[in-house]
């Protein structure tokens, strides 16, 4: 069974833990208890393949930022979570993305942009803004509500699909380039 290491990142209070717990335990946690770092595992079937999701729910608070490099090194894919009612959390997404790319030393890292708290009546980040940023980054955008469970499975499953795509692409590139290019042939006269 394939195991996928997923990391949930974003500013404090955007609902990273609520999304993760909704996926794992099917219930909504409405009280805010800042996370330092929690790990969850769940077996799921995605596109007919049984797999194990190893999900790291990370600290959004700045005082725990020193821990980020370590989990970014081990993660295979990242949910970049912001709250639709917080423009600041949306602005912070770029910083998380750049840090992930720096730590992974790669331009292409599997990521999904997630706009959470879509059940709230007032949004400070519009759908079009988020879609435009996702398009610039070349990643999918999913709107979620941990409270109503809207889009929760879709966000995590889309990330697994992005990881699979990335592995397929790397596998193809690796197979192509191992033989030297021989243009000239020697002839004995």
Swiss-Prot record:
CDD domains from the UniProt entry: H_N_K_Ras_like
Residue ranges of coiled coil: none
Subcellular location: Cell membrane
Record comment: activity regulation: Alternates between an inactive form bound to GDP and an active form bound to GTP. Activated by a guanine nucleotide-exchange factor (GEF) and inactivated by a GTPase-activating protein (GAP).
A GO molecular-function annotation: GTP binding
Membrane topology qualifier: Lipid-anchor
Biological processes annotated in GO: signal transduction
Motif Effector region boundaries: 32-40
Keywords: Cell membrane, GTP-binding, Hydrolase, Lipoprotein, Membrane, Methylation, Nucleotide-binding, Prenylation
Cysteine methyl ester PTM positions: 186
Catalytic activity: GTP + H2O = GDP + phosphate + H(+)
Enzymatic class: hydrolase
InterPro entries assigned to the protein according to its UniProt record, in alphabetical order: P-loop_NTPase, Small_GTP-bd, Small_GTPase, Small_GTPase_Ras-type
UniProt keyword annotation of Lipoprotein present: yes
Annotated EC: 3.6.5.2
Covalently attached lipid (S-geranylgeranyl cysteine), positions: 186
Binding site for GTP: 10-17, 57-61, 116-119
Role according to the record: Ras proteins bind GDP/GTP and possess intrinsic GTPase activity. Plays a role in eye development by regulating cell growth, survival of postmitotic ommatidial cells and differentiation of photoreceptor cells. During larval development, mediates Ptth/tor signaling leading to the production of ecdysone, a hormone required for the initiation of metamorphosis.
Protein name per UniProt: Ras-like protein 1
Organism, as annotated: Drosophila grimshawi (Hawaiian fruit fly)
